[in-house]
Amino acid sequence: MDTLSYKTVSLNKATVQKEWVVIDATDLALGRLASRVALVLRGKNKPGFTPHVDCGDNVIVINAEKVILKGDKMTDRVYVRYTGYPGGQRFTTPREILAKRPAELVRRAVKGMLPKTRLGDMIIGNLHVYAGPEHPHQAQNPREIKLNEI
């Protein structure tokens, strides 16, 4: 490159290079884990970050059942959903969610940290959460990253 270019190069769908990464959630605080995962999903850790393009990596979170919540958050925090019927509000605690579907707890925390737009809906599709240490994505050759390396 002999001349300087003063144009900002934005990524697009064709030029984005996505990787697969694995994050082990064992003994990690839910909020800290979710914020780092959201950062990688969005692509903000890459130098070519473009806000309107899905330029993040595909993230696999394993051992979601071993995530921790500090203090009394296991029992005091309440997740609310609505069935659509009168009087249909349903309340659940993280302890109940962790007992039934541990992956849902991590997925819900990460989704809350992504944009509330169509792009955010696309990005959450790049998140794969599994309760145990096994995952079916070995063919993608994911690289393992530690939480403090992001």
What is the meaning of each model-derived region?
Residues M1-R108, R118, P136-I150:
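Ribosome large-subunit tunnel/peptidyl-transferase-proximal elements
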Residues V106-R107, K111, I124:
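Hydrophobic, well-ordered secondary-structure segments
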Residues G120-Y130, P136:
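C-terminal structural segments of small proteins and small subunits
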